[in-house]
Amino acid sequence: MDSQTVGILGGGQLGRMIVEAAHRLNIKTVILENGDQAPAKQINALDDHIDGSFNDPKAIAELAAKCDVLTVEIEHVDTDALVEVQKATGIKIFPSPETISLIKDKYLQKEHLIKNGIAVAESCSVESSAASLEEVGAKYGFPYMLKSRTMAYDGRGNFVVKDKSYIPEALKVLDDRPLYAEKWAPFSKELAVMVVRSIDGQVYSYPTVETIHQNNICHTVFAPARVNDTVQKKAQILADNAVKSFPGAGIFGVEMFLLQNGDLLVNEIAPRPHNSGHYTIDACVTSQFEAHVRAITGLPMPKNFTCLSTPSTQAIMLNVLGGDEQNGEFKMCKRALETPHASVYLYGKTTRPGRKMGHINIVSQSMTDCERRLHYIEGTTNSIPLEEQYTTDSIPGTSSKPLVGVIMGSDSDLPVMSLGCNILKQFNVPFEVTIVSAHRTPQRMAKYAIDAPKRGLKCIIAGAGGAAHLPGMVAAMTPLPVIGVPVKGSTLDGVDSLHSIVQMPRGIPVATVAINNATNAALLAITILGAGDPNTCLQWKFI
């Protein structure tokens, strides 16, 4: 494939997964890290690895002498040494030393983003003194965030100053660090977007995800984020623009806040693979690690290579953290191995409380199904989620990734169509419900039918009374199977609707059920879904 050798500064789990991706592409990797048991070195049995620190100029120069490209799995490296080795040898370094230097100082990162018109929380530089922190409280109010400018990750280096009485403790915790303060951002969710940038400056964003933190460490990631499509797209655009402002190629993790008023703010950026992107290994066309390797070596980056594997793919990433019990976290991994569509990734690290030991990816066509599997893996339920097992929990008809669209010409049809919705809920099938009239809103009907496959729908149930043109009109504009439900009217008892729907011309098929029989329409939709995906094939009987 490619004869380039990639040198990686840092040998942790991110380096390990970069190595895995590079090996599949026949790209040699050399690691700079202390010791021979670093996670990245464990899976790459070469004699060329450098035993040393990624902050040692001599070790960096030694690594550069063996490689064509240098990259990082951690931003806290000696960027001055990178600049010097690049001047001396001309070696390619991605991301650029300038970018790494800007990003690893979080206050400089904020100033850079502001300069480039990227929305961030208001912040200011502060001194390590009680008087300075009291001034911040007077300026921003309480609470506010006190942060270390450097060497801060996984919540380390952050302190919430809730009121004036917390200032002494904040100074003790962040003793002797360069600091800055940030105005409190009243967020409703934390989101993240992975963005990969090519050598020629093109950017490609992965789906927007939602991150859940516990004790300041990422605990779970929901992909895609449980927000509406507009917010998802706005987050991708914001992330793209933020990454475009930095020079150099590679993958970037962009963390952001979704505020209570709906605005988005960039929290911080990582110039490397990121914990919030681990789900991409199993849920996307190309993992964040392979995308990074492609970007820094100039390999092809085709359109849509950062998309989810299918339009309806849903995923949850669960971090495996070290606990108080030695190797106790591996009990959770064993449960994951018992769970269909759950993949375990361990990093080869010695257990320590709070340490990232690995992660688990759960992938399905339904977020509810992913959550059900997550609950078993975490031990909150003792029932192994078999393929045919479905809970009876109701799924809202406003699911962000529905598989079935339930439409009708008027809200007067809802009492009939709700019977079908209840069946879909019973079988835990995600669906959406909306009013689409063939006569009153024809343009909306056309857009709905045309866009349905792109949004991940697999089947449409259309209820209509009277002239009942809706099912046939929708079927004429979508490749999806359409099931028509004749709704009983006030004059001809629904026979007119039945005759209208069932007599579609050749080439425009519409499956037609009995008058008012939305129940059978839903069961037929479930059968269609099962036939198209054996992994989610449902077992049921007629009643």
Curated annotation (Swiss-Prot):
Gene3D superfamilies: 3.40.50.1970, 3.40.50.20, ATP-grasp fold, A domain, ATP-grasp fold, B domain. GO terms for biological process: 'de novo' IMP biosynthetic process. It catalyses: 5-amino-1-(5-phospho-D-ribosyl)imidazole-4-carboxylate + H(+) = 5-amino-1-(5-phospho-beta-D-ribosyl)imidazole + CO2. Pathway: Purine metabolism; IMP biosynthesis via de novo pathway; 5-amino-1-(5-phospho-D-ribosyl)imidazole-4-carboxylate from 5-amino-1-(5-phospho-D-ribosyl)imidazole (carboxylase route): step 1/1. GO terms for molecular function: ATP binding; metal ion binding; phosphoribosylaminoimidazole carboxylase activity. SUPFAM superfamilies: Glutathione synthetase ATP-binding domain-like, N5-CAIR mutase (phosphoribosylaminoimidazole carboxylase, PurE), PreATP-grasp domain, Rudiment single hybrid motif. It is an enzyme of class 4 (lyase). InterPro entries: Ade2_fungi/plant, ATP-grasp, ATP-grasp_carboxylate-amine, ATP_grasp_subdomain_1, PreATP-grasp_dom_sf, PurE_ClassI, PurE_dom, PurK. ATP binds at residues 137-192. Its EC number is 4.1.1.21. Residues 110-297 form the ATP-grasp domain. PROSITE patterns: ATP_GRASP. It holds the Pfam family PurK_C. Keywords: ATP-binding, Decarboxylase, Lyase, Nucleotide-binding, Purine biosynthesis. In the C-terminal section; belongs to the AIR carboxylase family. Class I subfamily. PANTHER family: PHOSPHORIBOSYLAMINOIMIDAZOLE CARBOXYLASE (PTHR11609:SF5), PURINE BIOSYNTHESIS PROTEIN 6/7, PUR6/7 (PTHR11609). HAMAP family: PurE_classI, PurK. This is Phosphoribosylaminoimidazole carboxylase. It comes from Ogataea methanolica. The lineage of its organism: Eukaryota, Fungi, Dikarya, Ascomycota, Saccharomycotina.
